[in-house]
């Protein structure tokens, strides 16, 4: 993107409504970052990552008209027919096909494979990934996949056909929807991929009982441009680009995080949301 075009976008962003809030970025560490998804052996910390709050400006996305391949995210209005998101069968048999059709239509891709989902229900003081506790909003800046783990996810899920698929463009896109609106508690903030530098991303091990995944923690950069959707409703979804194999200037990684909105009133309903993760194959 040319400097003139970028400058025009910067001016337009500064004209948008915005708030200031604290986002948690990873602190510098000489060690390889590791986080366990289960209770680790005695004496081993659940995570060795340290996060530091930084005040940032977060713009109202609704007037920004972001594009998935430019900023790395998009806000789309689309209702769902699913009424009960505690029903796993409804999620897999109804919601998955709805989201697949929505992604195909929005991206123009040839094939979409939705491979998992997470329902989050915030509980005050709860720690994420604790046994018996619903998954909690992730209050730290991160990206779900890395240069290494993106292709590896395709190999793990699709086996023998993976290598031929990896010869063409593919992406990993999250589909994020609130289950109750308007969202005032722990809304999602997303970062313009074009405002992040490669050095901002820190590869981190995510340790499961049967495998080790890799995600990106993110270091603070004052140039990051953040966006959120005020009072997001259950009829809206975020598309978040977590990986893209294209290296032609297309948005590849869009950091994101939940955050505490300082303007939110007291005693608001706790956030409930669902996110799907999808492999998106473009056939080119």
Where are these regions (language model features)?
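Non-heme Fe(II) oxygenase catalytic core, chiefly the N-lobe of the double-stranded beta-helix
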Residues: 9-216, 220-230
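Catalytic core of Fe(II)/2-oxoglutarate
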Residues: 216-284
């Amino acid at each position: 993107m040319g400097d003139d075009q970028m400058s025009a976008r910067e001016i337009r962003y500064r004209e948008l409504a915005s708030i200031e809030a604290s986002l948690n970025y990873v602190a510098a560490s000489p060690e390889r970052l590791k986080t366990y998804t289960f209770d680790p052996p005695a004496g081993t910390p659940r995570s060795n990552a340290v996060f530091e709050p930084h005040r940032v400006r977060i713009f109202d996305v609704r007037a920004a008209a972001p594009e998935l391949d430019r900023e790395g995210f998009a806000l789309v209005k689309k209702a769902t027919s699913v009424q009960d998101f505690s029903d796993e069968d409804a999620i897999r048999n109804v919601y998955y096909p709805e989201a697949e059709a929505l992604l195909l239509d929005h991206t123009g891709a040839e094939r979409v494979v939705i491979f998992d989902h997470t329902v989050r229900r915030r509980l005050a003081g709860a720690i994420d990934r604790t046994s018996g506790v619903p998954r909690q909003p992730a209050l730290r800046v991160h990206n779900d996949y890395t240069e290494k783990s993106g292709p590896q996810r395709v190999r793990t899920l699709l086996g023998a056909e993976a290598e031929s698929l990896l010869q063409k463009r593919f992406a990993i896109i999250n589909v994020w929807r609130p289950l109750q609106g308007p969202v005032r508690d722990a809304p999602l903030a997303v970062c313009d991929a074009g405002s992040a530098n490669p050095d901002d991303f820190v590869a981190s091990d995510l340790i499961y009982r049967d495998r080790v995944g890799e995600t990106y923690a993110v270091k603070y950069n004052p140039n990051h441009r953040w966006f959120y959707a005020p009072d997001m409703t259950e009829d809206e979804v975020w598309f978040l680009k977590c990986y893209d194999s294209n290296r032609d200037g297309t948005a590849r990684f869009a950091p994101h995080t939940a955050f505490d909105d300082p303007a939110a009133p007291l005693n608001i309903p706790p956030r409930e949301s669902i996110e799907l993760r999808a492999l998106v194959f473009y056939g080119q």
